[in-house]
A protein has these predicted regions:
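PRPP-associated nucleotide enzymes
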Residues: 1-172
Length: 172
């Protein structure tokens, strides 16, 4: 159970024994990003303290991933900056709190693929590609005259993959 104390701090309570269990926490870190992230970290901690055998964090939206491959990441690689790399810091926080595995959707920004490396060998990362699930969902309901447009240039490949999936699935 997740709630808040009167002062706004997050309060996590586990309502049953999870000792020796495989536990799955489903929590996106979308806006309000920081609140959702803190809730996730505290849930992982609560399950770990309750002696869960394994904790898998299912994070449909992994917040702070947009900086990966961007300006701050490039500066950090060149050691020209001391800026934080939030994606790496969040990965470290999750592992420190006790997560054993991460499952996310479209984890890396298109064309990047670097976030999984932030977890090193400490927590395996599974990335589910939404494109293929989207094809299965939209194929029966999208008109053959539909126009598929990319939100921005970095998403062009995903858009083409989605279109190809529809065309390859009998979409005409």
């Amino acid at each position: 159970k997740s709630g808040k104390f009167l002062d706004g701090e997050i309060n996590i309570r586990i309502g049953e024994s999870v000792r020796g269990c495989d536990c799955y926490i489903i929590q996106p870190t979308c806006p309000p990003t920081n609140d959702n992230l803190m809730e996730l970290l505290l849930m992982v901690s609560a399950f770990r303290r309750a002696s869960a055998k394994r904790i898998t964090a299912v994070i449909p939206y992994y917040g702070y991933k947009l900086e990966v491959g961007g300006q701050s990441m490039q500066r950090s690689k060149n050691k020209e900056s001391t800026a934080a790399i939030a994606s790496a810091d969040i990965a470290q926080m999750l592992v420190t709190m006790g997560v054993d595995r991460i499952v996310s959707v479209d984890l890396q920004p298109p064309g990047q693929g670097e976030i999984e490396g932030f977890f090193a060998n400490s927590a395996p990362v599974d990335c589910i590609e939404a494109t293929y699930a989207g094809v299965e969902y939209f194929r029966p309901i999208v008109s053959k005259d539909a126009v598929i447009v990319s939100a921005n240039p970095t998403c062009t490949k995903k858009t083409r993959d989605f279109q190809s999936g529809l065309l390859g699935s009998g979409y005409r």
